[in-house]
């Protein structure tokens, strides 16, 4: 089933029906741009984050050179706070530059992002076809800062203003020296972080794709300036391979390099890893992850103050008195390289992806419809999520065929044994066919059924989700067989 023929409405309905994703505050009519992840959704997200953390941090071998990498490198983790010193956002440029342009329609009272007006529906048009705004009285574009403002302490006062972080990256930059001095590591090295970020999007849309509260998986990789281009190429290619390893088809992925006019003012190079989401038109892709070569912009900003581009150089922005408009910390964030006896400000390569977008892409990729015969041999349509076993919320389901003859007791014992290692589900209610269908829709790779033959020869039926093929496996061999098939 191709992405072009998949219905985003059906995928969203499945997510609600099977407990992947719920509208936040739904009993109060919901709140736009916020989503709750249900029992299966939270497991899917956790598996995505665990896979990322394992591949980026705990599974990294710092004693050998990975394929395609310029050299060995170290990798550590960090968890920084959601609310940080407000000066961080001024020095980084977010306070002045982190905004979208929006327009209001005086006719229909709707609000649109200025760069999405051609793809937005007009509420007053019966057809609601995107871009039909010829009769609308639109305002001139205005700036809208995307950071959520709050206050620290008991006083609502300008001096107490703070912001919910719009990205996790700045926490890693301001902790650069702390990590360097406490972790016995040297450049090149990376700092990885998974955490919540917040952006007050003007028009959140397309299910969970554009949300106001979301989780990011970001890594800041610090390297010497002369090797930064090679590291940028390495991380750009490696991150594409990671998505393929989780089950996204290469045909549905695209690596798009930004042109010079599209890049941020600090960027030395940026590439987006994009996915062909079903809610987009054929041939269109939506961003999954950005990989940016940020140069020395971030560490210099937090040393010197907010930087602006002056020709080919980044210089500190000055006020009318010649002082930094938004001062940095004044701390020395440069690095002394013992091997070369040189001092420099490290360059940064940043792969930054979204947990929610990754989960959404995996759900879209996995969604399929086919027909399989029921107990009487009559073809029945089914919905199945062909999730990669590594990120499937439930790894296996255990069923007794009937609720008698000792089958529930044997099934429960198998369930308890497997649960020590994996997330396993037990179900003894309803017909076996309906139990299979529920697990197919939940993305469970394997179902284990205890039946009459189990009593005789201590074997069970192991059913494959994708092929529906069933094989007999000895109970004593079940854990090793399942581990091999799950690749875990």
What residue ranges belong to the model's regions?
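NTP/phosphate- and nucleic-acid-binding module
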Residues: 1-488
């Amino acid at each position: 089933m191709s992405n072009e023929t998949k219905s985003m409405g059906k995928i969203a309905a499945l997510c609600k029906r099977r407990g992947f994703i719920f509208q936040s505050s739904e009993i109060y009519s919901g709140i736009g741009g916020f989503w709750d992840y249900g029992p299966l959704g939270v497991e899917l997200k956790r598996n995505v984050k665990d896979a990322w953390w394992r591949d980026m941090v705990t599974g990294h071998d710092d004693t050998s050179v990975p394929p395609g990498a310029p050299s060995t490198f170290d990798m550590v983790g960090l968890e920084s706070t959601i609310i940080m010193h407000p000066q961080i956002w001024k020095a980084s440029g977010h306070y002045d530059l982190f905004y979208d342009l929006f327009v209001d329609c005086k006719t229909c009272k709707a609000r649109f992002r200025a760069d999405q007006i051609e793809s937005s529906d007009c509420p007053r048009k019966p057809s609601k076809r995107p871009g039909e705004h010829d009769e609308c009285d639109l305002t001139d574009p205005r700036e809208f800062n995307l950071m959520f403002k709050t206050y620290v302490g008991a006083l609502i006062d300008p001096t107490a203003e703070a912001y919910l972080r719009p990205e996790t990256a700045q926490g890693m930059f301001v902790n650069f020296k702390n990590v360097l001095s406490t972790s016995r590591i040297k450049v090149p090295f990376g700092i990885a972080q998974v955490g919540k970020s917040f952006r007050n999007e003007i028009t959140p849309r397309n299910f969970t794709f554009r949300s106001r509260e979301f989780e990011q998986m970001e890594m800041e990789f610090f390297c010497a300036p002369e090797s930064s281009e090679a590291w940028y190429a390495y991380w750009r290619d490696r991150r594409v391979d990671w998505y393929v390893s989780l089950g996204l088809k290469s045909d549905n992925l695209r690596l798009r390099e930004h042109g010079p006019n599209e890049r941020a003012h600090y960027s030395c190079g940026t590439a987006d890893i994009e996915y062909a989401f079903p809610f987009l038109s054929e041939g269109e892709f939506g961003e999954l992850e950005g990989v940016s070569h940020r140069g020395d912009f971030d560490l210099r900003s937090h040393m010197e103050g907010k930087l602006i581009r002056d020709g080919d150089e980044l210089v500190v922005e000055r006020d009318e008195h010649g002082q930094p408009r938004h001062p940095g910390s004044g701390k020395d964030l440069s690095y002394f390289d013992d091997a070369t006896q040189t001092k420099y400000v490290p360059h940064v390569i940043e792969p930054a992806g979204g947990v929610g977008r990754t989960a959404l892409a995996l759900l879209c990729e996995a969604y399929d419809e086919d027909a399989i015969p029921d107990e009487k041999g009559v073809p029945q349509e089914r919905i199945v999520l062909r999730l990669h076993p590594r990120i499937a919320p439930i790894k296996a389901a255990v069923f007794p065929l009937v609720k008698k003859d000792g089958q529930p007791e044997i099934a429960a014992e198998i369930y308890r044994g497997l649960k020590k290692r994996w997330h396993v589900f037990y179900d003894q209610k309803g017909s076996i066919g309906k139990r299979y269908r529920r697990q197919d829709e939940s993305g469970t790779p394997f179902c284990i059924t205890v039946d009459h033959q189990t009593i005789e020869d201590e074997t069970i039926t192991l059913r494959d989700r994708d092929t529906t093929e069933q094989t007999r496996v000895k109970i004593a061999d079940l854990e090793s067989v399942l581990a091999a098939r799950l690749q875990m």
